[in-house]
Amino acid sequence: MSASSTAAAVPADGSGLIVTEAAETGHHQAFWLWVLCLTGVDYFSTLAYQPSIAITSAGRLAPLATVLLVLVTLFGAVPIYCRVAKSSPHGQGSIAMLQRLVHGWTGKFLVLTLLGFAATDFVITITLSAADAAKHLIENPHFEKAPEWLHSQIGITLTMILTLGALFLKGVREVIGVAVALVVVFLLLNLVVIAGGLMTLLREPQLISAWWERLVAGDLGIAGAHGEPLPAAPAIVPLTFGSAAMMTMLLFPKLALGLSGFETGVAVMPQIKGDATDTEQNPAGRIRRTQYLLLTSALIMSVMLIGSSIVVTTLIPIEALAKGGPAFERALAYLAHAEGGRTLLPFFGDTFGTIYDISTILILCFAGSSALSGLLNLIPRYLPRFGMAPEWVKATRPLVCVIIAACVIVTLLFKASVEDQSAAYATGVMVLILSACAAVFIERYRERSGSRWRRIPWATGFIGLVFLFTAGDIMIAKSEGLIISLFFIAAIMGVSLVSRAFRSDELRTVRFRFVNNESRFRWNTLQHLEVPVLAPHRPGGRTLDEKERELRAWHHLEDDIPVVFVEVSLGDTSEFLQEPVLNIVHEGGRYIIKVSRCASIAPTLASLAISLNGASRPIELHFGWSDESPFKMNLGFVLFGEGNVPFLVKELLQDAIPDTARRPRVIIG
């Protein structure tokens, strides 16, 4: 918002500044199970590739690693995000919690860093989902009849991403009804495939025995899962319980994709219908139903992950799951098509498999649209409020173009490979979960009383250490995700700081608040008196009597001209929009406006002048000279809200009120 637009918002009677930002539009609210499907298009769609990634990462240990993943999900992620839902019930998630807990520029840079990881999460969701959708399309038997030039993994992936961007440029948005249909059909088809596999294992228990015997013998099959040639006579090292447990814990982070979806789960909170008794300050019904959503989605996903892992590990040869194999990145689709000569249920085959592929492709594309929508909501939510967004961020279309361009670059960088992008995706997911753990840990610590050791929430700390280990392992094993995240962080910080510098000449004042009714009454009195002179005074130096004598002498003010003094104390200078608090006192025959909790001095003084500006004659602001260098003063203004105040006030007033006859006058002497 420019200074001129703020001035237009000032009432003609000079009664003060009004809110400069549009009020948030209400969200359409629905039953929590339907909203679960909206977040489920992101969370549940990972079933399309998670079982295959589990095998390539953990080999025959995949079922055990998946069980550990489920335990971490149910006893780690779910409790953490249930607390996030309670502490941030308006859909802003863990990032908003940390912003409240960490103040100043440290908090702003922390938010920008987390936005970089969130951008990684959402962008990779778009590219990875499109890549796996392309994989399912290419491997479908009916698609084999298509011309050879259409069988390009990169080409189809880019086409899907560009189509998604074009739809958003046209104004297409996802709706809950479509999400419900897609999720229900996709989950039912996956349930049929998994149930068919489990029934086969019940009929042929020797398949489980064979898997277990090879596992106990130490034949993990990890090399084969990566497409590497298996040794003709591998050295057998029997696997003990301890070594199996240790390897499972070490391999578990590679399955971290199964933890995606929780941040989205709290982001959709405004769309959940709560109780009739809910209030804005305490939406207890919405919080409770969001916690139902988080637990229900985690339970559904846990059952699906364990079932799919057991079925895929025991029924599909490792060689088929290896890179380049027919089941690579599409394990459940491989079973649905009855490939490999094994028909789990009589109706499995090309027809059922094609239905499964269509459902998978649709939900993966919808997951991409959900991620793009998430970014379009996330970036404008923070950056404009920080004064760190250029004007075009407010428009959807330019932001869509930037995000789609990033998706195209990432797709080309990873050659549209699902496996290669999985680590980058997991990096963004784990850092966001880790930020939620940190926010919950700090909040619980501050809530408790007693000694330092008694205040520490040990359970939350242990969960945080598990996620810290997971995130660290992913970043060390595959640093691509960290590199991409750092690129996004650098881009966001660069644009944000440049934008903050360019927007430093805006008024930035949302409204004035008052410490008590007396101050409000005196404010109204000053507006009706049409104050002729406003004089800033820095507390702690000269007394007001000395300041007034010097002011009248240097500025040739008669004794009968009243002077209102303004004392400004800064609050959080990292904030952009400000709501200064006014304490107006009457001492020694003069009015003193004591301003606190403001982010910047010059916009505060300019806003005061506009609000107190008389209808018959302009108000005058009288300043003294400063001996500081211009560069130091300008830098101090951008970073700390101080600096060359008289010049900046004059610039702000010129932009706000073009009419020189009505504009408050700035006098320096």
Features from the language model and the residues they span:
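Hydrophobic alpha-helical segments and their helix-loop junctions in multi-pass secondary transporters
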Residues: 187-231, 310-317, 436-451, 472-475, ...
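C-terminal membrane-solvent junction of multi-pass transporters and transport-like membrane proteins
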Residues: 209, 213, 390-399, 433-482, ...
